[in-house]
UniProtKB/Swiss-Prot annotation:
The modification N6-(2-hydroxyisobutyryl)lysine is found at residue 168. PROSITE patterns: ER_TARGET, HSP90. Glycans are attached at residues 62, 107, 217, 445, 481, 502. Homodimer; disulfide-linked. Component of an EIF2 complex at least composed of CELF1/CUGBP1, CALR, CALR3, EIF2S1, EIF2S2, HSP90B1 and HSPA5. Part of a large chaperone multiprotein complex comprising DNAJB11, HSP90B1, HSPA5, HYOU, PDIA2, PDIA4, PDIA6, PPIB, SDF2L1, UGGT1 and very small amounts of ERP29, but not, or at very low levels, CALR nor CANX. Interacts with AIMP1; regulates its retention in the endoplasmic reticulum. Hyperglycosylated form interacts with OS9; promoting its degradation by the endoplasmic reticulum associated degradation (ERAD). Interacts with CNPY3. Residues 288-323, 750-803 are annotated as: Disordered. GO terms for molecular function: ATP binding; ATP hydrolysis activity; ATP-dependent protein folding chaperone; calcium ion binding; low-density lipoprotein particle receptor binding; protein folding chaperone; protein phosphatase binding; protein phosphatase inhibitor activity. The gene is HSP90B1. It comes from Homo sapiens (Human). It catalyses: ATP + H2O = ADP + phosphate + H(+). Pfam families: HATPase_c_3, HSP90. Keywords: Acetylation, ATP-binding, Calcium, Chaperone, Disulfide bond, Endoplasmic reticulum, Glycoprotein, Hydrolase, Hydroxylation, Nucleotide-binding, Phosphoprotein, Sarcoplasmic reticulum, Signal. This is Endoplasmin. The modification Phosphothreonine is found at residue 786.
């Protein structure tokens, strides 16, 4: 019995010791979740203690303090307009709740600006707290989000006035704007801050909002509201802030995402990374620290070392405490807005590497920018800006061109991000430019809808465009031609078409291929410099490719005389040139249209007139008989040297290239009356009087105007000229038949000779067919044999009858 009692006692002692050991391990190895306590075990320096106190101050009230607050607080009703306004905010912005944090940080920044301004004239203004910061802390356990600033703070009266009522005129205007925006289906996400009501966006994510504030001229007070009513009471904790304001949000269940550190950090970086004051978030990180070993572990390690070195005798040194490396989670304030707004610094003080680093951080690009410009605009509106040209065009640059919103220009007002969701900061053709615009003259948190009608926007836009074009103009020629033009050339051409006020500046940026060089592109300035002495027009030829353009009959005489011709090979090129009335006093001439004339001497003029008179019978015959319904007129050409003829559009008609483009667009967008009208316009038929075909036609029609061969030749020449001039034939079968007839005549083949009929071949017999035929033949032979036997029998019977 005694043995059993002793055994049981031993088991109890062992179990107690085991539990005790487990408890000790748990205490050492578990990370505490209370944000108000230190996570750094053995560290007790002043810095850690200070951080602990800061964390405790940001925590919510305890149960007894909350009870006292509820019992003794003075209750207030919101103004009727405030109630209506809060409902509008909550109902209109429920899909864009995240802006609440931007509004709270913006208000905190304003409060910090105010106390800093006061401190310039009052040396004791910062005595309560020397720091000028914004701090954010998430408390998942208590479902609280704290935003604290060390700004000017609010007195009791200011809490009631600023958070419970709004100036009536401002409220009415705000409500009208909100209602209009909702009726028009526009975004209201930025409108709330325009009238100083951004604070109420906190109710988008919070069931209850608690504001703790300390002003230098009053004691610390607490304002609390559930959006139906609010209360104000002196803080039973006393002065815990020193100076400033803490906004504590009791988050709704569906807003729990805003207690995630990553979510808060991303929102701060998105909206507030360029605020003038440092913004900190209470966050954790894992660090490796050294801790003293326990006695058992140290003794075990010493034993292992003594066993390994038993053969070596050394003098005993002073024993140092044994330590081990342990990973611990450490909580501390993490700075969020570490990227300083370099556009606020003078451009001379910013290094090139800083611009490149800022661009990569700002645009999320891995390549350096092709070009950038940093400037301050002054005058009617003052703003600072940095603009960048990326190395390559963004993907889908022309997808939904004009309707897709560009998010490459970010608007800041006093370093607070407002929006990148609008059309009007940059014109459509500059939709590849990236950058920031920061203005102190615009209203803080101006909405996108209000911004679009803001008179200062047009001024900002105008200056941005001018500065962008200056930046592009300064790109080195080799980089411009090799890189920029390949990536963004189409944008510049669209700019010439769309931007009337900057058309001359944009024209200087245009580049085209030309007959001057087989591969290099040229500017219009360079073309004008190379023009002949008496040349008064800039000649261009449009085609689907360079090869098509330079082999066109329209450029034959120009190239032979040494004139340079610009080749337009992109669909937008001809539109672009048509939008330019002139360049440097020189008008543009499409060589595929009427109007191409050369400077000629009196002798040359007399010779031309003589040729025109000589070929007048042929010209009249073509216009009145052979091509009566196909051409407007027939003339002797001044532009042809090798080709027999060409089809030329009128000055206001479509060239072959333009007609092809317009018809392709018509097929995509449906029938267009104007397309059919322009396509049906008759054109001028130009002949080359020196070509042997034309000269022989003149001889033949003088002999016989009704010669069918000559009539066919005229039509074939017209249709061939149509194709060579870039137009499409309406009836390709008829054209093919005529070509065939001309070939027959050239080979002395009767035009009416028929094609030989192909002899019909009997189908080859298969094995099955052969078997069936054999069986059929055998049956026929048997039938024949039977018939013969019957006939013989009949004959013998007849003979017997006769006998």
């Amino acid at each position: 019995m005694r043995a059993l009692w002793v055994l049981g006692l031993c088991c109890v002692l062992l179990t107690f010791g085991s539990v005790r050991a487990d408890d000790e391990v748990d205490v050492d190895g578990t990370v505490e979740e209370d944000l108000g306590k230190s996570r750094e075990g053995s560290r007790t320096d002043d810095e850690v203690v200070q951080r602990e106190e800061e964390a405790i101050q940001l925590d919510g009230l305890n149960a007894s303090q909350i009870r006292e607050l509820r019992e003794k607080s003075e209750k207030f009703a919101f103004q009727a307009e405030v109630n209506r306004m809060m409902k509008l905010i909550i109902n209109s912005l429920y899909k864009n709740k995240e802006i609440f944090l931007r509004e709270l940080i913006s208000n905190a920044s304003d409060a910090l600006d105010k106390i800093r301004l006061i401190s310039l004239t009052d040396e004791n203004a910062l005595s309560g707290n020397e720091e000028l910061t914004v701090k954010i802390k998430c408390d998942k356990e208590k479902n609280l989000l704290h935003v604290t600033d060390t700004g000017v703070g609010m007195t009791r009266e200011e809490l009631v006035k600023n958070l419970g009522t709004i100036a009536k005129s401002g409220t009415s205007e705000f409500l009208n704007k909100m209602t209009e925006a909702q009726e028009d289906g526009q975004s209201t996400s930025e409108l709330i801050g325009q009238f100083g009501v951004g604070f109420y966006s906190a109710f988008l994510v919070a069931d209850k909002v608690i504001v703790t504030s300390k002003h230098n001229n009053d004691t610390q007070h607490i304002w609390e509201s559930d959006s139906n009513e609010f209360s104000v009471i002196a803080d039973p904790r006393g002065n815990t802030l020193g100076r400033g304001t803490t906004i504590t949000l009791v988050l709704k269940e569906e807003a729990s995402d805003y207690l995630e550190l990553d979510t808060i950090k991303n929102l701060v970086k998105k909206y507030s990374q360029f605020i003038n004051f440092p913004i900190y978030v209470w966050s954790s990180k894992t660090e490796t620290v050294e801790e003293p070993m326990e006695e058992e572990e140290a003794a075990k390690e010493e034993k292992e070392e003594s066993d390994d070195e038993a053969a070596v005798e050394e003098e005993e040194e002073e024993k140092k405490p044994k330590t081990k490396k342990v990973e611990k989670t450490v909580w501390d304030w993490e700075l969020m807005n570490d990227i300083k707004p370099i556009w606020q610094r003078p451009s001379k003080e910013v290094e090139e590497d800083e611009y490149k680093a800022f661009y990569k951080s700002f645009s999320k690009e891995s390549d350096d920018p092709m070009a950038y410009i940093h400037f301050t605009a002054e005058g009617e509106v003052t703003f600072k800006s940095i603009l960048f040209v990326p190395t390559s065009a963004p993907r889908g640059l022309f997808d939904e061109y004009g309707s897709k919103k560009s998010d490459y220009i970010k608007l800041y007002v006093r370093r607070v991000f407002i929006t990148d969701d609008f059309h009007d900061m940059m014109p459509k053709y500059l939709n590849f430019v990236k950058g920031v615009v920061d203005s102190d003259d615009l209203p803080l948190n101006v909405s996108r809808e209000t911004l679009q009608q803001h008179k200062l926007l047009k001024v900002i836009r105008k200056k941005l465009v001018r500065k962008t074009l200056d930046m592009i103009k300064k790109i080195a020629d080799d980089k411009y031609n090799d890189t920029f033009w390949k990536e963004f050339g189409t944008n510049i051409k669209l700019g010439v078409i769309e931007d009337h006020s900057n058309r001359t500046r944009l024209a200087k940026l245009l580049r085209f291929q030309s007959s001057h060089h087989p591969t290099d592109i040229t500017s219009l300035d360079q073309y004008v410099e190379r023009m002949k002495e008496k040349q008064d027009k800039i000649y261009f030829m449009a085609g689907s490719s360079r090869k098509e353009a330079e082999s066109s009959p329209f450029v034959e005489r120009l190239l032979k005389k040494g004139y340079e011709v610009i080749y337009l090979t992109e669909p937008v090129d001809e539109y672009c040139i048509q939008a330019l009335p002139e360049f440097d006093g020189k008008r543009f001439q499409n060589v595929a249209k009427e109007g191409v004339k050369f400077d000629e001497s009196e002798k040359t003029k007399e010779s031309r007139e003589a040729v025109e008179k000589e070929f007048e019978p042929l010209l009249n015959w073509m216009k009145d008989k052979a091509l009566k319904d196909k051409i407007e007129k027939a003339v002797v050409s001044q532009r042809l040297t090798e080709s027999p003829c060409a089809l030329v559009a009128s000055q206001y008609g479509w060239s072959g290239n333009m007609e092809r483009i317009m018809k392709a667009q018509a097929y995509q967008t449906g029938k267009d009356i104007s397309t059919n009208y322009y396509a049906s316009q008759k054109k001028t038929f130009e002949i080359n009087p020196r070509h042997p075909l034309i000269r022989d036609m003149l001889r033949r029609i003088k002999e016989d105007e009704d010669d069918k061969t000559v009539l066919d030749l005229a039509v074939v020449l017209f249709e061939t000229a149509t194709l060579r001039s870039g137009y499409l034939l309406p009836d390709t079968k008829a054209y093919g038949d005529r070509i065939e007839r001309m070939l027959r005549l050239s080979l002395n083949i009767d035009p009416d000779a028929k094609v030989e009929e192909e002899p019909e071949e009997e189908p080859e017999e298969t094995a099955e067919d052969t078997t069936e035929d054999t069986e059929q033949d055998e049956d026929e032979e048997m039938d024949v044999g039977t018939d013969e036997e019957e006939e013989t029998a009949k004959e013998s019977t007849a003979e017997k009858d006769e006998l």
